[in-house]
Design a protein with these regions (language model features):
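N-terminal cap/lid segment of alpha/beta-hydrolase-fold proteins
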Residues: 1-32
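Short, surface-exposed "cap/lid" segments of acyl-processing enzymes
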Residues: 30-73
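Glycine-rich "HGGG/HGxG" loop immediately N-terminal to the catalytic nucleophile
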Residues: 49-50, 76-94, 276
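Conserved acidic catalytic loop of the alpha/beta-hydrolase fold
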Residues: 100-118
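Conserved hydrolase catalytic core segment
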Residues: 117-122, 126-153
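Alpha/beta-hydrolase
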Residues: 160-241
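Conserved alpha/beta-hydrolase "acid-adjacent" motif
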Residues: 247-253
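Catalytic histidine-centered segment of alpha/beta-hydrolase-like enzymes
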Residues: 274-285
Length: 304
């Protein structure tokens, strides 16, 4: 395995009480108009930099942070407590609510540091649940919310049906081991041809540079405690991104959630040829385009 290092950004360290949390920033390019401030939220089985600032030889803009910063966005991400460079010492399983607490602290730091008045949120998988829960709690800090690989009740989720078989194991411990085979399994479970081996190997190298185990809390939540959200309380402009082959959620589950979102400035996008972990797919540039379009769309002049 090759140990991965990250360059071109700025480290920030913040406190959640006595817990130390890692944040990573890549500033907007000065060559284009400023487009906003994005806060990226990682999922259950990888920290922030492997997900959003990945380098893959021969694959342009594997780093979403690089692409969006070059398009005028100030980009931020953080390792939730229990992941990556952030503190891991507490004897808890670092569940989704705890992750939303991290986002509350991280978002306030970004607003204070940059002078931004609100953020463009993006969360993937359990990170989407954290981002949505944070938005429920702090809608005044969020301009727009993007939920990728999202799940609401779990109804119709093939991935969660399989994961529930290991629920007793997840309940019995606060962390679960991961290795290279596990990372590859993420891309094999739904539709294996949506990714290439070079990208998955680079992703595995990056993940395993920072972690050899992951918290069980988000798995426990997604297997036994859904729904965690009330869509009627998510009042900001939102988009749901659903990979064509992603088994994390049934289509009807997502449509039902979407129908209940009260803000009519909302979108639902099915992404062709994509399974789970959209930024590591062959069609990743399509995902960037969809997100960029959503984030930069003007506010409607007439709202009824």
């Amino acid at each position: 395995m090759s140990n991965v290092t990250w360059t071109g950004g700025e480290e920030h360290w913040i406190q959640k009480g006595d817990i130390r949390l890692f944040m990573w920033q890549k500033k907007a390019s000065s060559k284009v108009p400023h487009a906003g401030t994005i806060f990226f939220v990682h999922g259950s089985s990888m920290a922030s930099q492997p997900t959003f600032d990945l380098y893959v030889p021969g694959r342009p803009y594997s780093s979403a942070m690089d692409w969006f910063s070059d398009h005028g966005f100030d980009t931020w991400t953080m390792d939730n407590e229990g992941y990556g460079r952030s503190d891991k010492h507490r004897d808890i399983n670092f569940d989704i609510s705890n992750g939303a607490d991290d986002l509350a602290v991280g978002s306030q730091y970004i607003l204070d540091k940059t002078g931004a008045t609100s953020l463009l949120m993006y969360g993937i998988s359990s990170g989407a649940l954290k981002a949505a829960l944070f938005t429920e709690r702090h809608p005044e800090r969020v301009a727009k919310l993007a939920l990728d690989a999202f799940v609401w009740t779990g109804e119709g989720s093939h991935t969660l049906d399989q994961r529930k078989k290991k629920l007793p194991e997840f309940l019995a411990q606060n962390r679960r081991p991961i290795d290279r085979d596990f990372v590859h399994s993420i891309f094999k479970r739904d539709h294996p041809d949506t990714t290439d081996a070079v990208t998955v190997n680079a992703f595995a190298d990056a993940i395993l540079t920072l972690d050899d185990s992951m918290p069980t809390g988000t798995y426990v939540d997604m297997c036994s405690k859904l729904p965690l959200l009330d869509p009627t309380k998510i009042t900001v402009s939102s988009i749901i991104l659903r990979g064509e082959y992603d088994g994390i959620a049934g289509m009807d589950d997502l449509i039902d959630f979407y129908k209940l979102l009260p803000n009519m400035n909302k979108q639902f996008s099915v992404m062709r040829g994509i399974s789970h972990a959209s930024f590591q797919q062959k069609n990743y540039m399509m995902v960037y385009h969809i997100l960029n379009s959503f984030y930069t769309m003007p506010e409607p002049a007439y709202q009824g």
